[in-house]
């Protein structure tokens, strides 16, 4: 599948990526190759593969939720770059 220059520019605009004319040509070739590969994969017969197939045979890999040792407040703050009133002090995330 060969993408047009306009299609590549449209995708770049949606992704908020500025591309030079040279980059558009490179991306056009690369994206077209990726889409060709996807088209090839779509032709693979997977009718005998169960939808939830996996190879490890494991049914659950989660450990039991067990309460363990906890750090004291002093231990937790020991390497904090900045602290105030016994709490981590971080730069504001939201502006008022």
From Swiss-Prot:
Q: Disulfide connectivity? A: none
Q: Which domain of life is it from?
A: Bacteria
Q: Which UniProt keywords apply?
A: ATP-binding, Ligase, Nucleotide-binding, Protein biosynthesis
Q: How does this polypeptide assemble, per the annotation?
A: Heterotrimer of A, B and C subunits.
Q: Which organism is it from?
A: Chloroflexus aggregans (strain MD-66 / DSM 9485)
Q: Which reaction does it catalyse?
A: L-glutamyl-tRNA(Gln) + L-glutamine + ATP + H2O = L-glutaminyl-tRNA(Gln) + L-glutamate + ADP + phosphate + H(+); L-aspartyl-tRNA(Asn) + L-glutamine + ATP + H2O = L-asparaginyl-tRNA(Asn) + L-glutamate + ADP + phosphate + 2 H(+)
Protein name as it appears in the record: Aspartyl/glutamyl-tRNA(Asn/Gln) amidotransferase subunit C
Offer one Pfam family short name for this entry.
Answer: GatC
EC class name: ligase
Q: Which family does it belong to?
A: Belongs to the GatC family.
- Function description: Allows the formation of correctly charged Asn-tRNA(Asn) or Gln-tRNA(Gln) through the transamidation of misacylated Asp-tRNA(Asn) or Glu-tRNA(Gln) in organisms which lack either or both of asparaginyl-tRNA or glutaminyl-tRNA synthetases. The reaction takes place in the presence of glutamine and ATP through an activated phospho-Asp-tRNA(Asn) or phospho-Glu-tRNA(Gln).
Annotated Gene3D superfamilies: Glu-tRNAGln amidotransferase C subunit, N-terminal domain
UniProt GO molecular function = asparaginyl-tRNA synthase (glutamine-hydrolyzing) activity; ATP binding; glutaminyl-tRNA synthase (glutamine-hydrolyzing) activity
The Enzyme Commission number assigned here is: 6.3.5.-
Q: Alphabetically, which GO biological process terms does the record hold? A: glutaminyl-tRNAGln biosynthesis via transamidation; regulation of translational fidelity; translation
């Amino acid at each position: 599948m060969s993408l047009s220059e306009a299609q590549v520019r449209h995708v770049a605009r949606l992704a908020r990526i500025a591309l030079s004319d040279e980059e558009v040509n490179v991306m056009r070739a690369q994206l077209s190759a990726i889409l060709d590969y996807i088209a090839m994969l779509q032709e693979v017969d997977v009718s005998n593969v169960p939808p939830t197939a996996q190879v490890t045979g494991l049914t659950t890999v989660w450990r039991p939720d067990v309460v363990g040792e906890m750090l004291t407040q002093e231990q937790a703050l020991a390497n904090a770059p900045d602290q105030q009133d016994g709490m981590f002090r971080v730069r504001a995330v939201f502006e008022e």
